[in-house]
Design a protein with these regions (language model features):
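Cytosolic regulatory modules rich in charged/polar residues
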Residues: 1-129
């Protein structure tokens, strides 16, 4: 889980170009969108949705692009969380504490790493033998 203080998100009121800047700068493909506070998540924005919309032109706002957020509790077991990701066809969830406050964010990659170990990205493939 990514703790709250390390969660990268944007406010619903920012301009789309600002969202793109954050996605590029931080290297994320999905980030939460909030209404003034991480405790008020409006949804999640996917880089591919933003890029496709920018490429096709036209006027749009961040709210036009957000997808519903998946919320989960910090006490959920790994197997349950994986099932939730599959059922909701998503790869990111907002983790809430007992009082409904956002305590962090978890991705399907986090879950898979708990099961199979660290996943290293951009590792060149080596021939066997």
């Amino acid at each position: 889980m990514i703790p709250r203080e390390h969660v990268v998100g944007v406010d619903l009121e920012v301009r789309p170009d600002e969202v793109l800047d954050v996605l590029i700068e931080k290297g994320h493909s999905r980030i939460p969108v909030s209404r003034g506070s991480l405790d008020r998540i409006a949804g999640v924005i996917y880089a591919r949705d933003l890029l496709a919309t920018v490429r096709h032109g036209g006027l749009f706002t961040v709210s036009d692009l957000i997808r519903p957020a998946m919320f989960t509790s910090g006490s959920k077991r790994i197997a349950e969380l994986l099932s939730e990701f599959q059922r909701n066809n998503t790869q990111i969830a907002i983790v809430q504490g007992a009082e409904g406050r956002t305590i962090g964010l978890v991705t399907i990659e986090d879950v898979l790493e708990e099961i199979v170990g660290e996943i290293h990205e951009d590792v060149p493939l080596r021939p066997a033998g």
